[in-house]
Amino acid sequence: MKTAIFKKPGLIAVEDHPKPTIQQPTDAVMRVVRACVCGSDLWYYRGDSEHGQDAIGHEAIGVVEEIGDDVTTMKPGDLVIVPFAFSDNTCPHCENGVQTA
């Protein structure tokens, strides 16, 4: 799959990387349909913040391709949104339904 890799300020390369696979029973694999550049991606690109040579981009929409055995809230073919923040679903904010607080 194609992946945007931050190399250094001012340089992002598109490289081929292996497709993700289910590693845990709670995992889901999504095919990205659209992705966007976030303001924090621009921090690295402009050199305002440090970032190793790694994949960038963390806001996207896509289609679920595969789910782990413990996943019950989605199924293959569902359209999903990747939020800008990750949630653990165990903290007080998550338990109150505000996962990105």
Question: Where are the model-predicted features located?
Answer:
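Residue-level recognition of beta-strand termini and adjacent short loop/turns
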Residues: 8-10, 24
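Glycine-rich beta-strand-centered segment in the early N-terminal region that forms part
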Residues: 20-36, 45-95
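Extreme N-terminal starter segment of soluble prokaryotic enzymes
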Residues: 1-2
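Short, non-ligating residues that shape and space the ligands of small metal-coordination modules
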Residues: 100
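Short acidic/polar mixed-charge low-complexity motifs
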Residues: 10-11, 70
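Short glycine/threonine/proline-enriched tight-turn/helix- or strand-capping micro-motif at secondary-structure
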Residues: 11-19
